[in-house]
């Protein structure tokens, strides 16, 4: 839905190439950071005769919280070198924002799974749809409304808007959407935070989930490898992003 807008309002095809590349990385990292635990959660929480459901929820929730936090700390500690190696040395904040987004999204997959387990279909669908619409609205605001306001009433938005930031606002919109989604899930997260972690159950879930992680990596890498590896095929980073932008837009539309 956002592709036509991106291809129309972003400064050049290279900007959409950046979006395509970073969201390719995000999809792969999301599989790595959930490491099959969503499936493991459903497998064990439904064994009520053997496991206490809330202990299963707490164990998986704390495990994802810990791994997501460690990932975030590692990325931010190595942010300059990671950004430079991926070709974003001039904008390390892109990598920082995407790392935060994927860490929170990985953690939130378990509260969403808990909603499905509890049969709260309306709440599950409502938060998901709100996140989608909010992301669309924020993209329209930053990429269409703000440039218009800057052209006609610059003093109204000069305190927060940078007209030269361009594609960065795609990631800013996603950050806001992710944080609001997390806040909406707090009532569903708290029961798991208050419950006790069962180390024995957690080990069983991890053993069960590991093969799912391997299959997940294989599946998602098959879908995203082209977007991830594309920039490394060219010596000229700017040209690579331009070509990836064209390829990524055609891929989405097709």
Language model features with spans:
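Small-residue-rich midsections of specific transmembrane alpha-helices
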Residues: 2, 20-45, 100-110, 216-225, ...
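Short membrane-interface helical motifs at transmembrane helix boundaries
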Residues: 3-7, 70-89, 146-158
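Membrane-interface helix-loop junctions in multi-pass transport and translocation proteins
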Residues: 8-15, 118-126, 130-182, 240
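Alpha-helical transmembrane segments of multi-pass membrane proteins
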Residues: 28-29, 65, 69, 73, ...
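Transmembrane-helix boundary and interhelical linker motifs in polytopic inner-membrane proteins
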Residues: 7, 11-15, 29-63, 83, ...
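Interhelical loop/hinge segments that connect adjacent transmembrane helices in multipass membrane
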Residues: 150-169, 182-223
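Membrane-interface junctions at transmembrane-helix termini in multi-pass inner-membrane proteins
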Residues: 44, 104-128, 189, 193
